[in-house]
């Protein structure tokens, strides 16, 4: 819900571009499917990220995997980084894959309430309690792999 673009894509090339003080890695992608962003950019060909992982830049494998990529659009370019949800497609659970097609868009009005210690509870109808923090110190816990907040 917070991303401008959500796509399934295979990285087919990469190039280091000298934009900004540290450089930008530009990945060429073959878009397999778009889940979000039809109006902002109906077809994504390039994904931009910081060249350095220390600046939240992503390192993606070329011609090896398909990825679920999320990001923002600025000045007609798609940007992503370590703070965005990026995962190899084959590492997603069946629930996550189904969520992309059928469920996640129904939860954009939900508020996730993180539970760090017990007891914890929701305080309004549009809240979903996220308890992954109790056992797995956050992502990726069972809830993040198998649940969706829908209101």
Curated annotation (Swiss-Prot):
The disulfide bonds in this chain are 1-108, 115-120, 128-149
Q: Which processes are annotated in GO (biological process)?
A: negative regulation of membrane protein ectodomain proteolysis; response to cytokine; response to hormone
Return the annotated region ranges for Mediates interaction with EFEMP1: 71-151
Q: Where is the NTR domain?
A: 1-108
Matching entries from SMART domains are given as: NTR
Q: Does the keyword ATP-binding apply?
A: no
The subcellular localization recorded is: Secreted, Extracellular space, Extracellular matrix
Signal peptide per UniProt: none
The molecular function terms of the Gene Ontology recorded here are: metalloendopeptidase inhibitor activity; protease binding
Cite the entry's keywords alphabetically: Disulfide bond, Extracellular matrix, Metalloenzyme inhibitor, Metalloprotease inhibitor, Protease inhibitor, Secreted
- Site residues by UniProt (Involved in metalloproteinase-binding): 2
Q: Which domain of life is it from?
A: Eukaryota
Q: Where is this region: Involved in metalloproteinase-binding?
A: 53-54
**Pfam families documented for this protein:** TIMP (PF00965)
Cross-referenced SUPFAM superfamilies, in alphabetical order? TIMP-like
**Family under the similarity heading:** Belongs to the protease inhibitor I35 (TIMP) family.
What the protein does comes down to: Complexes with metalloproteinases (such as collagenases) and irreversibly inactivates them by binding to their catalytic zinc cofactor. May form part of a tissue-specific acute response to remodeling stimuli.
Share what the entry says about its subunit structure, partners included. Answer: Interacts with EFEMP1.
Protein name (record): Metalloproteinase inhibitor 3
Q: What is the lineage of its organism?
A: Eukaryota, Metazoa, Chordata, Craniata, Vertebrata
